[in-house]
Each structure stands twice: as structure tokens, then as C-alpha cells.
Swiss-Prot record:
It comes from Anaeromyxobacter dehalogenans (strain 2CP-C). This is Dual-specificity RNA methyltransferase RlmN. The gene is rlmN. InterPro entries: Aldolase_TIM, Methyltransferase_A, RlmN_N, RNA_MTrfase_RlmN, rRNA_lsu_MTrfase_RlmN/Cfr, rSAM. GO terms for biological process: rRNA base methylation; tRNA methylation. Residues 350-372 are annotated as: Disordered. Reaction proceeds by a ping-pong mechanism involving intermediate methylation of a conserved cysteine residue. Belongs to the radical SAM superfamily. RlmN family. PROSITE patterns: RADICAL_SAM. GO terms for cellular component: cytoplasm. Its cofactor is [4Fe-4S] cluster. The lineage of its organism: Bacteria, Pseudomonadati, Myxococcota, Myxococcia, Myxococcales.
Length: 372
């Protein structure tokens, strides 16, 4: 489901070596390609006109034969806790969201990789959208560039790169758009570009097992797995991808995931009241993760109207964490951020709304009647 049927090269989407080849083909010296690349990916230029030290003749030739992806900021919402959610409009009018999460020691951007999502997790608002299309590499990296520039305007940091960390946990399943993701990662990690550290970039997956090993072999970024259940029956009901790649297969892929010594896989566990938050779930989770260098992020469910799930009862998350810690599993409770602007985990949905199949699934799990 790739985007626009347009063969015009997008400068923002080109790997560094392909950009160099394109500019060499115009008869230019190699240093010109580096100049253009740094304007695109270090300074986040929104147009060719901004590239003031690039000869006008070259800019005009590039304008004739290429295009330059630049997202338009459609909305900006600021939370009381400092979180900012941006909705970006693409060239074909699609909307995607990214979220800025400021902390004392880091400034993180949660990045989207698709318009919508085909995975269909029943507790997630993005899943109600379905999948419209994949994002191009330039549309992925430009979320970072637009965010960096906006943060400088807001006085949230100094240029050219206030952001310190990236998490690919926004709209979409990153590994389902691996071609674009890999190019985007290379651009974002490049020394002539933003030069993010591998240690500060995390890619999340719902469990697309065949692509997980490829990610580990071809990059050194960190892996997060959206687990959310401790039995196949439970996970089948809330995450349909489990019917293709059940828990045993997923966890085997985690054990085999290529990692540098000292690294850990983060397991995201969204806690749904009355569904997956019982003491027995904590005990099963500890057993499942045995032998895997793991850290568990416990995420109290952010309630979404119409989806039918509820947050855990008071104290349930802390008790769950304590049970894991007692079984030698590193576990932390992730603080919900941006809930007042629908920017928290599972709340991103730039288009669409709740669907009946998700309400029915929630009702089946919780024993409550489905609305509608």
C-alpha cells in the first residue's frame, strides 16, 4: 500500500548514496551532495530555497526533476504535563500524528510509520482507522525535522536538534513498513544528518516475527515488543496478529534477536482492567520471559470512548509490578503522558473512530454487554 503513484524522486526519501549519485549525474562535485544532504537531514530544510549556499542553478535543476517532502502542521495540542501532539498533513491530504515527550534528561519524539494500522489491536484507537497507506521514508523523517524546528521556535531547545530520543511507537506497525523504516533509520542515524545514537532509538512491534530478525541483523536500534497478554487465547482476542505468530513463536524470536551484550528487549504490557491484570498473569509473564534479557513497561490503560475496555483498579498495576520484581523481572510502571490531549499510548487516531468489532471483543473479554 505504498503512497502516491509518482515516479518523481523525493529528495527527503533518498538514501545518502542515492542522493550523491543523483547529484553526480547532474555534473556536480561530491561536496555538493553533502551540502544538500545536510540541509535536508541536519537542518531539516522545508524547501530548496532555504539552501542558500547551494548554487541557484543546481537548486533549479533539482526543482525540475525531484520533489521535496515537507509535512504541513495541521494541529498542535499542548498537555498540562508538557506533552505536545502534532497532527501532520501529507502531500495527498492524509493525517498522521507524532508526540513530543519532554523529561528532565531527555526529549523524546514518538514517531508514526503508517497512516492508520492493519494490525487491529482491539484496545487501540489507531486500529479503528484501518490502514490507509504506508508512509514514505521522507514522511517518517520529516516528523522529526518538523518537530525539531517547532521546538526551537517554542524555546524548548537549541538547534539544530533539540530531540535526543526517538521511539517508533506512533500510528502503524513499523515492521509492516520495513522498507521505509530502514531507510528512515539510516537517514536519522547518519553522521551528516541528525546523528541520533542507536541507543536512543527504539522500534516497537506487535510481533511481526519474520521481520524482527532482519531488524536486529541490519540495525543496532533497540527493540520493544507490544505483548499485552500471557496466554494465546487472551492475546488472540485483543491482538489478532497472535493468530499468525503465537506467543511461543514470538518469544522464540525474542530469544534469538541479535543484540549487543548488555542490551534488553522492552516488553510493553498495556494493563486492561479485568482482562490481563490478575496475579496469575504476572506469574505467567515472569515464566514467559525467563531467559530473555527483558524489561517490562506496565502501561495502565488509557480509556478510549467506544472501545469498551477499562483501566485497572487502583493499586492493581503496582501489585502486578511487585509480583514481577519478586520473580526477578525488571518492571516499571510507565507514567501516562498527554491523556488530556489524546496523545497517550493507544490514543492516536487522526482519522476515523471506534468500530463495532472492537466493542464486541471488549464485551466478550470483560463480560459486559456491547454498546450499540
Amino acid at each position: 500500500m505504498d503512497v502516491l503513484h509518482d515516479d518523481t524522486p523525493d529528495l527527503r526519501s533518498l538514501p545518502q548514496e542515492r542522493l550523491a549519485s543523483l547529484i553526480a549525474g547532474l555534473g556536480e562535485k561530491p561536496f555538493r551532495a553533502r551540502q544538500v544532504y545536510r540541509w535536508l537531514h541536519l537542518r531539516g530544510a522545508a524547501s530548496l530555497e532555504e539552501m542558500t549556499d547551494v548554487p541557484r542553478a543546481l537548486r533549479e535543476r533539482l526543482a525540475e526533476g525531484t520533489r521535496l517532502t515537507t509535512l504541513e502542521r495541521a494541529t498542535e495540542q499542548r498537555s498540562a504535563d508538557g506533552t505536545i501532539k502534532w497532527t501532520w498533513r501529507t502531500r495527498d491530504g492524509k493525517l498522521v500524528e507524532s508526540v513530543y515527550l519532554p523529561e528532565t534528561d531527555r526529549k523524546t519524539l514518538c514517531v508514526s510509520t503508517q497512516v492508520g494500522c492493519a494490525v487491529g489491536c482491539t484496545f487501540c484507537m489507531t486500529g479503528t482507522m484501518g490502514l490507509a497507506r504506508n508512509l514514505e521514508p521522507g514522511e517518517i523523517v520529516d516528523q522529526v525535522h518538523r518537530a525539531n524546528r517547532r521546538l526551537i521556535e517554542l524555546g524548548e531547545g537549541e538547534g539544530p536538534r533539540p530531540l535526543t530520543n526517538l521511539v517508533f511507537m506512533g500510528m502503524g506497525e513499523p515492521l509492516a513498513n520495513y522498507r521505509s523504516l530502514k531507510v528512515a533509520l539510516d537517514l536519522l542515524l547518519s553522521e551528516d544528518g541528525p546523528n541520533f545514537s542507536h541507543r536512543h532509538v527504539t522500534v516497537s512491534t506487535s510481533g511481526l516475527v519474520p521481520v524482527m530478525r532482519r531488524l536486529g541483523e541490519e540495525t543496532q536500534v533497540k527493540l520493544a515488543v507490544s505483548l499485552n497478554a500471557t496466554t494465546d487465547a487472551q492475546r488472540d482476542a485483543i491482538m489478532p496478529i497472535n493468530r499468525r505468530y503465537p506467543l511461543a513463536e514470538l518469544l522464540r524470536a525474542c530469544r534469538e534477536f541479535p543484540m549487543k551484550q548488555g542490551r534488553r528487549i522492552t516488553f510493553e504490557y498495556v494493563m486492561l482492567g479485568g482482562v490481563n491484570d490478575a496475579p496469575e498473569d504476572a506469574e505467567r509473564l515472569a515464566r514467559l520471559l525467563r531467559g530473555i534479557p527483558a524489561k517490562v513497561n506496565l502501561i495502565p490503560y488509557n480509556e478510549n470512548p467506544g472501545l469498551g475496555f477499562a483501566a485497572p483498579a487502583p493499586g492493581a498495576v503496582e501489585r502486578f509490578r511487585d509480583l514481577l520484581v519478586a520473580r526477578n523481572v525488571t518492571a516499571v510502571v510507565r507514567k501516562n503522558r498527554g491523556t488530556d490531549i489524546a496523545a497517550a499510548c493507544g490514543q492516536l487516531a487522526a482519522e476515523g473512530g471506534p468500530g463495532d468489532p472492537r466493542r464486541r471483543a471488549a464485551a466478550a473479554l470483560t463480560g459486559t454487554p456491547a454498546a450499540g
